[in-house]
Amino acid sequence: MSKLILHNDDVNSTTKIASALIKCLDYELPAATQIIILAEGRKKGVIIKEGDFIELFMAQNCFEELNINTELIA
């Protein structure tokens, strides 16, 4: 099972990350807010989705278009 990891860096604002989670992964606002809180202060990032590699690859491309740092682990 593949994993998509969000790396929280100071370049991105919380509203930008929340908007990306909603756009790229169809998150609801409360879930997006919870992920942002979890990601704060974690150097390794936080897993935002697990599943099919192709689905996560497409989501990662969406995040890259928005200049948000993610990592896909196959």
What are these regions (language model features)?
Residues 1-74:
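Terminal domain-initiation and capping elements
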